[in-house]
């Protein structure tokens, strides 16, 4: 955890110097994004070592599943406040800084898998959110964009990070590729597939739970009199 703290401090100094001409609120979004990705890349290496009602959660979840969904909240709030162009800046800045620093916190294979999945999924989230941003239903844009991007992110990350056939990207994780009951359903599959399903389940649940802070923050933005951002072409 000390390494995480050191990385976050280093990240903050880089972010402030690199984006000195950007608004402080956008800098906060960039810092939040980098922090979420760094924490998730570190925590995804650790299964949840608990047994509840006979279910070994180590076969279902890693700790990273509980932090990463916050990245979609950061993206959607930035998109709503500043527009898709600035949201993409946050995604790209978060991607560049977090992947480089993740090489210290995690294995190179985890960093590559995380960076690839993060960049593609977050840019998809920005595009989908922007298409739906003025829907009459306030929750439609964050739910549709975040759930769709979560499916893509989960599929890309866990395949690249743990699939035995992709050993060219880095050494296999023996515990991850070991056969285990698929999401506690009875038939066996590599353990990382259960992690992927568990990760996706947590992300979808988090999308619903994070609607509360999303709604509160959007209300705060409106009360502050922020202007409606231009709809950019996707």
Briefly describe each language-model feature range:
Residues 6-7, 11:
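Cysteine-centered motifs
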Residues 16-85:
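Hydrophobic transmembrane alpha-helices
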Residues 34-37, 72, 94-98, 150:
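Residue-level recognition of pore/gate-forming positions within transmembrane alpha-helices
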Residues 37-45, 101-105, 161, 214:
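Structural signal for membrane-spanning alpha-helices in multi-pass inner-membrane proteins
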Residues 85-95, 140-142:
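Cytoplasmic-side transmembrane-helix entry/capping segments in multi-pass membrane proteins
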Residues 98-117:
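Interfacial aromatic-anchored transmembrane helix boundaries in multi-pass membrane proteins
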Residues 111-230:
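Membrane-embedded alpha-helical hairpins and interfacial helices in multi-pass inner-membrane proteins
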């Amino acid at each position: 955890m000390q390494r995480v703290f050191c990385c976050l401090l280093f990240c903050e100094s880089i972010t402030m110097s690199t984006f000195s001409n950007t608004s402080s609120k956008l800098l906060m979004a960039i810092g939040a994004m980098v922090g979420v990705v760094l924490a998730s890349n570190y925590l995804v290496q650790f299964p949840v070592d608990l047994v509840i009602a006979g279910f070994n959660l180590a076969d279902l979840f890693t700790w990273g599943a509980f932090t990463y969904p916050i990245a979609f909240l950061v993206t959607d709030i930035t998109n709503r406040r500043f527009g898709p162009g600035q949201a993409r800046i946050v995604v790209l800045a978060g991607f560049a800084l977090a992947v480089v620093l993740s090489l210290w916190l995690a294995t190179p294979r985890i960093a590559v898998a995380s960076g690839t999945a993060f960049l593609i999924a977050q840019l998809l989230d920005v595009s989908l959110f922007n298409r739906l941003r003025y829907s009459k239903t306030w929750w439609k844009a964050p739910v549709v964009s975040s759930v769709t991007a979560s499916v893509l992110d989960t599929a890309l990350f866990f395949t690249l990070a743990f699939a035995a056939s992709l050993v060219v990207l880095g050494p296999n994780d023996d515990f991850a590729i070991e056969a285990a009951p698929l999401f506690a359903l009875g038939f066996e599959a590599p353990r990382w597939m259960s992690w992927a399903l568990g990760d996706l389940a947590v992300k979808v649940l988090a999308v619903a739970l994070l609607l509360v802070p999303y709604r509160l923050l959007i209300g705060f933005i409106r009360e502050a009199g922020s202007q409606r951002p231009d709809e950019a072409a996707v």
